[in-house]
A protein has these predicted regions:
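Surface-exposed molecular-recognition determinants
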Residues: 2-165
Length: 165
């Protein structure tokens, strides 16, 4: 696992319907579980991916979050995908500052871009020193929340990549 790409998924089917993901975040099916004791001092975890609007209808907004374990790494500000070519991309880098353990200190930063009919909005996130239980498995996951339950609206976790170096 250490030394490069640990996980890569490209999915044509990992969709989240607005009718199922309104008012609360719902996890996409694609996840990656980092094995216990993988993140040690000076290990770098890189997470990247994209969410694509598969079907759009009306003015429903979409908010996306990326997690490591139970910690939110970044939140993509809600945007209104108005065409099936609209998307969001994200990347986040976590650096372990301590040996694997129950409270291994990590720091991180990353960014995101949304594209809504060609209009791009960018954002950034910084994670202050945060302790993770790296002596156990840590799950990388992505969730989304729609603003309403419009039946013909959905988004798909198009790609999810995890690198550990």
């Amino acid at each position: 696992v250490i030394g490069g790409r640990a996980y890569s998924a490209i999915s044509a089917t990992d969709a989240l319907l607005a009718s199922a993901g309104a008012s609360a975040h719902v996890n996409f099916a694609q996840t990656y579980s980092i094995p216990a004791n993988t993140l040690n001092a000076n290990s770098v975890l890189r997470i990247s991916g994209s969410v694509l609007a598969d079907q759009v209808d009306g003015t429903d907004t979409l908010e996306i979050k990326v997690y490591l374990g139970g910690t939110t790494l970044l939140t993509i500000t809600a945007f209104d995908p108005s065409a099936v070519t609209d998307f969001a991309t994200f990347n986040f880098e976590v650096v372990a500052r301590a040996a694997a353990g129950a409270t291994a200190a990590c720091v991180g930063s990353g960014g995101w871009v949304t594209s809504d009919t060609g209009t791009e909005i960018r954002g950034a996130a910084v994670m202050a020193t945060t302790n993770f239980a790296t002596n156990g498995a840590l799950v990388v996951k992505v969730s989304a929340k729609w603003s309403s339950t419009t039946a013909l609206t959905n988004a798909r976790l198009h790609t999810l990549n995890v690198d550990i170096v």
